[in-house]
From Swiss-Prot:
Keyword Lyase found: no
Species in which this protein is naturally found: Trichomonas vaginalis
Alphabetized GO MF terms: cysteine-type peptidase activity
Family recorded in the similarity comment: Belongs to the peptidase C1 family.
Protein name: Cysteine proteinase
Length: 22
């Protein structure tokens, strides 16, 4: 989503959250 670059910076934990739509 639009936050892809942001979650990539934060790390793998946020990748999981992103996959859940967070």
């Amino acid at each position: 989503g639009a936050d892809d670059s942001d979650w990539r910076k934060k790390g793998a934990v946020n990748v999981i959250x992103k996959d859940q739509g967070q």
